[in-house]
């Protein structure tokens, strides 16, 4: 009985705390669940991302109401995701590079990430699309 209880506690603990990114963790279909720009919650959060084998495509509605997309290459290195934008709905961003450090839940089905772009801080919580029909661990460290 005690062994089962300890096993259950260990299982819950491993799936309740965050983990850094490793190769293959970004692969899959994702949707943005929460979004903040400079700490301000965004009303429209509809980002969709598909990532596989070092490439990703992201579509979203901007704060201005316009639809945007980008196609990027990415590389996972020492807990960081390094991104280079290969195509973007705004030409001036093609070729831009940035990095972010995803903070994953133990089941690797949701993560929070923050990055700064043009002196603006963006924070998003992403979940795998499969979380709409299966139970996934959730993480939120937002102050609301």
Regions inferred by a protein language model and the residue ranges of each:
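Lipid interaction determinants
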Residues: 17-69, 82-144
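Short, structured beta-strand-loop surface elements
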Residues: 74
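Sec-dependent N-terminal signal peptides
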Residues: 4-13
